[in-house]
From Swiss-Prot:
The cytochrome bc1 complex contains 11 subunits: 3 respiratory subunits (MT-CYB, CYC1 and UQCRFS1), 2 core proteins (UQCRC1 and UQCRC2) and 6 low-molecular weight proteins (UQCRH/QCR6, UQCRB/QCR7, UQCRQ/QCR8, UQCR10/QCR9, UQCR11/QCR10 and a cleavage product of UQCRFS1). This cytochrome bc1 complex then forms a dimer. It comes from Osphranter robustus. It is a multi-pass membrane protein. SUPFAM superfamilies: a domain/subunit of cytochrome bc1 complex (Ubiquinol-cytochrome c reductase), Transmembrane di-heme cytochromes. Its main location: mitochondrion. Component of the ubiquinol-cytochrome c reductase complex (complex III or cytochrome b-c1 complex) that is part of the mitochondrial respiratory chain. The b-c1 complex mediates electron transfer from ubiquinol to cytochrome c. Contributes to the generation of a proton gradient across the mitochondrial membrane that is then used for ATP synthesis. It is found in: Mitochondrion inner membrane. Heme b b562 binds at residues 83, 182. This is Cytochrome b. Binds 2 heme b groups non-covalently. A ubiquinone binds at residue 201. Heme 1 (or BL or b562) is low-potential and absorbs at about 562 nm, and heme 2 (or BH or b566) is high-potential and absorbs at about 566 nm. Belongs to the cytochrome b family. The keyword Metal-binding applies.
Length: 381
């Protein structure tokens, strides 16, 4: 009799994806983030479900319903803190996962990469609508400022904004629909994750060397299940440290005040994981130009496979491109810092220089470095 795990129609799929999957023998800890993102998604869906059982999406009661969850619901404070800080862990893992893809040339699996970029955009949309739900000051004004950006679209902009708002300002209709979006999007993300994995398993995983690993594969279980379990424990440790010891460290103090349309906070800024894009948006004095730059800062990921000029896939043996990659990383950290600063000198000019160098590095310098490294590899005698 054949083993059930190899014959049962459903268990067979799980077996081919997580147990008998042939994996390269040399993939490093940078390949852990896929499973960590899966774990983050599960944590967010579960904690979110329990929060939704007690939350009310009405402007009059939303803020107090969140307070009620934290005060009166059994372990409500823990569920809320895990959900809020789980989002930060999600984005931390996402950024590292994308960075890994760029460093090791994983973007050359174009279908997997493109679905990944769509996933990134969907997760960003989910986080944005979720941030509005507690109906604090920063929730309200963040929603107002970001949705207002759509009014920069010529001709249909204003109509589009009012259509999204469900009125002439961010109000009850907006909050209700944002709650609906925030509930449905994680399930769309889950479906996209399955498509992402489907395309990945068509080609098999990349590895640090960037060389075809077919000649040396090992089974996913037990080697990578145990490795992923270690990564998961480390991530859960960091998440619990955040949620239990400093749950409000990454939040904004303004969100402890209920939303007030008559009082604007001195500095409107999004959560830390959007600050790099927010800095790029603010660095252009023109509204439409800023919105286009904001979109380009994320959508540029889609053209990265087209900008690959090197004969080698990975950056492992390419010191010049490595240097540029880490400059790009430092540049993104700088943008994140600038996004949280007030709009005044010297922050304005630093933000503008960092924004220009962000696009310059990706579109021009890294492809040129690839060509130069090809030239350096050619025999000169």
């Amino acid at each position: 009799m054949t083993n059930l795990r190899k014959s049962h129609p459903l268990i067979k799929i799980v077996n081919h994806s997580f147990i008998d999957l042939p994996a390269p023998s040399n993939i490093s800890a940078w390949w852990n983030f896929g499973s960590l993102l899966g774990a983050c998604l599960i944590i967010q869906i579960l904690t979110g479900l329990f929060l939704a059982m007690h939350y009310t999406s009405d402007t009059l009661t939303a803020f107090s319903s969140v307070a009620h969850i934290c005060r009166d619901v059994n372990y409500g404070w823990l569920i809320r803190n895990l959900h809020a800080n789980g989002a930060s862990m999600f984005f931390m893992c996402l950024f590292l996962h994308v960075g890994r893809g760029i460093y090791y040339g994983s973007y050359l699996y174009k279908e997997t990469w493109n679905i990944g970029v769509i996933l990134l955009l969907t997760v960003m949309a989910t986080a944005f609508v979720g941030y509005v739900l507690p109906w604090g000051q920063m929730s309200f004004w963040g929603a107002t400022v970001i949705t207002n950006l759509l009014s920069a679209i010529p001709y249909v902009g204003t109509t589009l904004v009012e259509w999204i708002w469900g009125g002439f300002s961010v109000d009850k209709a907006t909050l209700t629909r944002f709650f609906a979006f925030h509930f449905i999007l994680p399930f769309i993300i889950t479906a996209l994750v399955l498509v992402h994995l489907l395309f990945l398993h068509e080609t098999g995983s990349n590895n640090p060397s960037g060389i075809n690993p077919d000649s040396d594969k090992i089974p996913f279980h037990p080697y990578y299940t145990i490795k992923d379990a270690l990564g998961l424990m480390l991530m859960l440790f960091i998440l619990l440290m955040l949620a239990l010891f400093s749950p409000d460290m990454l939040g904004d103090p303004d969100n402890f005040s209920p939303a007030n349309p008559l009082s604007t906070p001195p500095h409107i800024k999004p959560e830390w994981y959007f600050l790099f894009a927010y800095a790029i948006l603010r660095s252009i004095p023109n509204k439409l130009g800023g919105v286009l730059a904001l979109l380009a800062s994320i959508l540029i990921l889609l053209i990265i496979p087209l900008l690959h000029t090197s004969k080698q896939r990975s950056l492992m043996f390419r010191p010049i491109s490595q240097t540029l990659f880490w400059i790009l990383t430092a540049n993104l950290i700088t943008l994140t810092w600038i996004g949280g600063q007030p709009v005044e000198q010297p922050f304005i000019i630093i933000g503008q220089l960092a924004s220009i160098s962000y696009f310059l590095l990706i579109i021009i310098l890294m492809p040129l470095a690839g060509l130069f490294e090809n030239y350096m590899l050619e025999p000169k005698w």
